[in-house]
Swiss-Prot record:
It comes from the Bacteria. Residues 121-165 form the LysM domain. Pfam families: LysM, Peptidase_M23. A lipid is attached at C26 (N-palmitoyl cysteine). This is Murein hydrolase activator NlpD. Residues 30-51, 210-219 have a biased composition (Polar residues). The gene is nlpD. Disulfide bonds: none annotated.
Length: 379
């Protein structure tokens, strides 16, 4: 069949018609395709908004959604580790002290603290110190220590404050067996020089007594170094004491005591006891301010209140053999190294170092306590 025949022409026209109809059907504009420009959010004004194609979420959006999930997990872990570390710190700082009536109370076990362990003549207050603690380690009565340093109740102290504790000799002044053994050893060194006040007084700490007031008798000891007040350490200066004392006491060395006088008026309420732990003198009751006189001529070798339990104490050396002691005085009217006469007023009666107004009176012969009633005239 040739290209110009009528049949070929008809078939060609029919084929073109079918192709035209098919193309016309595919070009229907009732559902226009979404413009490509809507992907970037720039659709034309006449474009149907319902046919916009929403782009898929970006990778950056997904990563930002995961980060908030990590942050809340880390925060609770930090808080949980901080709280247990703060709680146990607070009660530990409060354990050493207690508060009572707005004041700090220190809990000390005094049974484990050596009494009289401090040997200096002054003491500097440190943090945590109390007057009772200082009195304990220096071998003093806290009331006497307060009086000596003009400290009023309730006995408040300041850090750095210097207190006069009276242990200038370097020997702790306490009761108990430890100090007795130390004094006995010291006595063995001093006893061989001339019989002077140093020898007589040094032997006295080994002798104790008790009284009805309930004071501890172990602390009632006469001083062992006060007569040599110019010497700081008596054991070291034994040669000095043996050379100087005979010169001072030579005026009374050979003077016998013909008559003893009663040191005060009043009733004897405690008598002499020779047994161990007994009263090594006599106690005479009286009224505060009552006169105390020297029982015989002599020289004052000690006047002070450094010894716990004695209060204001005066010791008079009458000769190389005899001493007399007057304790619990209210006011002392003589000073150390002062010469006194028999019957001279040396003090007024009081209650320092004890619970009632009284005079504790002792006579010692060559450092040994004797019954004063054997020497005093009967009345």
């Amino acid at each position: 069949m040739s290209a110009g025949s009528p049949k070929f022409t008809v078939r060609r026209i029919a084929a073109l018609s079918l192709v035209s109809l098919w193309l016309a059907g595919c070009s229907d504009t009732s559902n226009p395709p979404a413009p490509v420009s809507s992907v970037n959010g720039n659709a034309p004004a006449n474009t149907n908004s319902g046919m916009l194609i929403t782009p898929p979420p970006k990778m950056g959006t997904t990563s930002t959604a995961q980060q908030p999930q990590i942050q809340p997990v880390q925060q609770p872990q930090i808080q949980a580790t901080q709280q247990p570390q703060i709680q146990p710190v607070q009660p530990v700082a409060q354990q050493p002290v207690q508060m009572e009536n707005g004041r700090i109370v220190y809990n000390r076990q005094y049974g484990n603290i050596p009494k009289g362990s401090y040997s200096g003549s002054t003491y500097t207050v440190k943090k945590g110190d109390t007057l009772f603690y200082i009195a304990w380690i220096t071998g003093n009565d806290f009331r006497d220590l307060a009086q000596r340093n003009n400290i009023q109740a309730p006995y408040a102290l300041n850090v750095g404050q210097t207190l006069q504790v009276g242990n200038a000799s370097g020997t702790p002044i306490t009761g108990g067996n430890a100090i007795t053994q130390a004094d006995a050893a010291e006595q063995g060194v001093v006893i061989k020089p001339a019989q002077n006040s140093t020898v007589a007084v040094a032997s006295q700490p080994t002798i104790t007594y008790s009284e009805s007031s309930g004071e501890q008798s172990a602390n009632k000891m006469l001083p062992n170094n006060k007569p040599t007040a110019t010497t700081v350490t008596a054991p070291v200066t034994v040669p000095t004491a043996s050379t100087t004392e005979p010169t001072v006491s030579s005026t009374s060395t050979s003077t016998p005591i013909s008559t003893w006088r009663w040191p005060t008026e009043g009733k004897v309420i405690e008598t002499f006891g020779a047994s161990e732990g007994g009263n090594k003198g006599i106690d005479i009751a009286g009224s505060k301010g009552q006169a105390i006189i020297a029982t015989a001529d002599g020289r004052v070798v000690y006047a002070g209140n450094a010894l716990r339990g004695y209060g204001n104490l005066i010791i008079i050396k009458h000769n190389d053999d005899y001493l007399s002691a007057y304790a619990h005085n209210d006011t002392m009217l003589v000073r150390e190294q002062q010469e006194v006469k028999a019957g001279q007023k040396i003090a007024t009666m009081g209650s320092t170092g004890t619970s009632s107004t009284r005079l504790h009176f002792e006579i010692r012969y060559k450092g040994k306590s004797v019954n004063p009633l054997r020497y005093l005239p009967q009345r």
